[in-house]
Regions:
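Transition segments tied to proteolytic processing and entry into folded domains
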Residues: 1-211
Length: 211
């Protein structure tokens, strides 16, 4: 069956990326990891522009899979890099070094169209991305011109404080709703006890007023 992963909204990818770079792959090298069981590939990208994070001239990203001698390992949903590829990559820091955030959802191909415009679109992937709340497959993001893509990244960065605040407000409302529900449940479960207590209070008040 197909490999299924949770679809990640664009703004969430921007929020969680340690860096976002545009650049060209200038070198790839695959080798066994320290355990000697798994192949990892190191791809060096000459950075043209950092859309988010520290401006660097080069970044080397590590991804699982690759080829060492006659041994080949690959994982569905993990992007591969080849010399000459032009990419936008969302970065995540790991103990092995930077990797691609959300794997195939964090890497984009950059190609030049017939009019000479650079177009950014998600890398091809065999994985199916699902909206887990609605339980439906999500279509890939539409191709965008490079300026449009950069604008979307900057808009997401700029809107983050507002979105965080809105999320906090929604969470407080949810907690209040739960609290109100708990109080209502308490009254529903204990209405006999509450009724007896109310009768007791009324009798006590009646006794006081008689004196």
């Amino acid at each position: 069956g197909a490999t299924v992963s949770q679809a990640v909204p664009f703004e969430e990818k921007v929020d969680n990326a340690a860096g976002i770079v545009l650049g060209k792959v200038v070198d790839t090298k695959s080798q066994m990891d320290a355990s000697g069981r798994w192949i990892v590939t190191y791809s060096t990208i000459r950075v043209e522009k950092a859309m988010k994070g520290q401006a660097v001239s080069e970044v080397t990203v590590v991804t699982p899979g690759g080829r060492v001698g006659t041994l080949n390992q690959s994982t569905i949903g993990v992007p591969s890099f080849h010399e000459g590829d032009e990419r936008v990559v969302f970065l995540k820091n790991t103990r092995l070094g930077p990797t691609v955030l959300y794997f195939d959802q964090g890497a984009y191909d950059v190609a030049t169209d017939s009019r000479g415009e650079r177009i950014v679109e998600p890398v091809q992937s065999d994985a199916v991305h699902m909206d887990t709340q609605r339980g439906v497959a999500v279509a890939n993001e539409e191709p965008r011109t490079l300026p449009e893509f950069e604008k979307a990244v900057q808009a997401a960065i700029k809107s983050r404080p507002q979105r965080v605040e809105m999320s906090a407000v929604a969470e407080r409302a949810r907690q209040q709703q739960q609290k109100n529900g708990t109080i209502a449940d308490f009254f529903a479960r204990n209405k006999v006890v509450i009724a007896i207590a109310a009768i007791g209070a009324a009798l006590a008040l009646w006794q006081l007023t008689r004196k």
